[in-house]
From Swiss-Prot:
The keyword Amino-acid biosynthesis applies. Its EC number is 2.3.1.35, 2.3.1.1. The gene is argJ. PANTHER family: ARGININE BIOSYNTHESIS BIFUNCTIONAL PROTEIN ARGJ, ARGININE BIOSYNTHESIS BIFUNCTIONAL PROTEIN ARGJ, MITOCHONDRIAL. GO terms for cellular component: cytoplasm. Belongs to the ArgJ family. The keyword Protein biosynthesis does not apply. GO terms for biological process: L-arginine biosynthetic process; ornithine biosynthetic process. Pathway: Amino-acid biosynthesis; L-arginine biosynthesis; L-ornithine and N-acetyl-L-glutamate from L-glutamate and N(2)-acetyl-L-ornithine (cyclic): step 1/1; Amino-acid biosynthesis; L-arginine biosynthesis; N(2)-acetyl-L-ornithine from L-glutamate: step 1/4. The record marks 130-131 as: Involved in the stabilization of negative charge on the oxyanion by the formation of the oxyanion hole. It comes from Mycobacterium leprae (strain TN). This is Arginine biosynthesis bifunctional protein ArgJ. The active site is at residue 203.
Amino acid sequence: MTKIVEIVNETRLLRAQGVTAPAGFQAAGITAGIKVSGAPDLALVFNEGPDYAAAGVFTRNKVKAAPVLWTQRVLSTGQLRAVILNSGGANACTGPAGFQDAHTTAEAVAAALSDWGTETGAIEVAVCSTGLIGDRLPMDKVLAGVRAIVHKMAGGVTGGDDAAHAIMTTDTVPKQVALHNRNKWTVGGMAKGAGMLAPSLATMLCVLTTDAVVEPAALDQALRRATAHTFDRLDIDGCCSTNDTVLLLASGASGITPPQADLDDAVRHACDDLCAQLQADAEGVTKRVTVTVIGAASDDDALVAARMIARDNLVKTAVFGSDPNWGRVLAAVGMAPVALDPDRLCMSFNGAAVCIDGVGTPCARDVDLSTADIDITVDLRIGDSAATIRTTDLSHTYVEENSAYSS
């Protein structure tokens, strides 16, 4: 469903468009046979220029997948012309052979684009993978798919939509966004991720595009500021992937250089909306939960406390059962390594006070948590800092999906 809202500077936000909404980009998504299911599994995003500036942020997991290592290396130039993404296999924990597979994939994309008429080098190609950890990719199918996908590229809605479908794993719907600035420049994006969503980006692949004229350093600033307040604050299950990658490419096709503040704002809004879509489609989700800690001594304390609550399985199962068990929330925040006074803690569910000065209110057990959106707010009453984490409940379906993922 198309979603249009008005945000800062009269920018239009639409979910029916994605990476090809900005001028200068084409994309495609095809079935290469990587997935046993026969679902689409190979995507390509191509920057037609005239500029090729790029930036990226990656998982902080020490066990990094081969495509992450490859893409970190090529991004040292601050330039990208293409991103090739596969679902159906993570190419993680595959050793030197897996890294060579990523390199070979980039070379194949460069060769196919060059044959298509756009001279491209492997060092200009980012590689992203998602799926089961520990197995090498079927390179015969990957390389055949690379040769085919170049001829399927399209601009407009079609190419971006096909690409967004092709990167899905346990996702049930594609995630896309486009922000059209009134000053005639655009930011678009697509993301995937439904499980292993935790900070250090969440488990996800995300490609963002813009037709603004932007230097790599400015892109890097915008992306890092955005991810720190969006993807890094989406925490579904506390598990951090080996493959997390967020890339931002700029074509310069609009001819417009926006102020840094406007670029920062647009990228953050795009990331924030994609985060909301990822949260809504998380594995086994029945409740979308927002955990906010206010009154903390510092921003770091607020973030740590909110994350402690969001990751607590007893809190998450209580939310799943629509049980207003506020004691579990206080028990969780009490374990956070932050400054707090238990006799000053206040808390609410969906705006209804359930705890004041560390003691439950008379109607605390009567709060209705049967709605799909749950807001948990804890006031430490120590300082002025605040932070919010997005999470979900913990359902039977989540356990079932993740107990048989590799079988």
